[in-house]
A protein has these predicted regions:
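Short aromatic-glycine-enriched beta-strand elements
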Residues: 12-17
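Structural detector for short beta-strands of small beta-barrel domains
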Residues: 1-11
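A short macromolecule-binding patch
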Residues: 23-31
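Residue-level signature of catalytic and energy-coupling elements of molecular machines
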Residues: 3, 44, 60
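OB-fold/S1-family single-stranded nucleic acid-binding modules
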Residues: 52-66
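Short nucleic-acid-contacting surface segments enriched for D/E, G, S/T with interspersed K/R
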Residues: 35-48
Length: 66
């Protein structure tokens, strides 16, 4: 699924993605395919990811920069 980074809290290692389906997905740094890219993610940046559901709601998996 395509999405846009809506918030990144790099010092805490997570952020949020607004999916093309209108839902907001939690993104942990471990979900970014190339972990070193996490530090370079910026709000408004377009990404591709797999949507999933975790214990606390929607989660982004396999996040990659498009």
């Amino acid at each position: 699924m395509n999405g846009t980074i809506s918030k990144v809290i790099s010092d805490k290692g997570f952020g949020f993605i607004q999916g093309e389906d209108g839902q907001e997905y939690f993104m942990h740094r471990s979900a970014v395919r190339d972990g070193s890219v996490f530090e370079q993610l910026r709000e408004g940046q377009t990404v591709v990811f797999d949507g999933g559901r975790g214990d606390k709601g929607l989660r982004a998996e396999n996040v990659r920069v498009s």
